[in-house]
Amino acid sequence: MAIKLKLRNKKGEFKTYYQEFVPYRKRLDYLKEEAEITDEYEKFVQQLPVDNNGKPIIPTAEYTDYELKLANFRAEFVANLFDDKAVTKDAILDGMEPSDATDEIMNIIMYDVLGYKKEDEDEEAPK
């Protein structure tokens, strides 16, 4: 199983990077760190006032901070999967289209690192 990541460099040229091996420890590291980020956010949300439906009223800035923290963590995590030092968090953030970045990063994490299969998601999707 090789992980593939296509990035655009500062000259506008594309380069595809491959990583042949990812240790199981990376899976565990991802699960732990994402849980810590999410738990921190959930603790914050529990302290917020709620609306008439009992849903927390989350300030936009706070939610955006959470999304940014999670997105930066995921970009850094994917960069650290690669042995090639050219693959960095900044290279990922600067070398991918916004419309593709989230899907590409999450595909690497979900399928290559965590081991989910696309068929698993298809079975869970409502029909």
Where are these regions (language model features)?
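Short N-terminal mixed-charge amphipathic segments
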Residues: M1-L68
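Detector for Asparagine
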Residues: N9, N52-N53, N72, N80, ...
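C-terminal charged interaction modules
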Residues: A79-K127
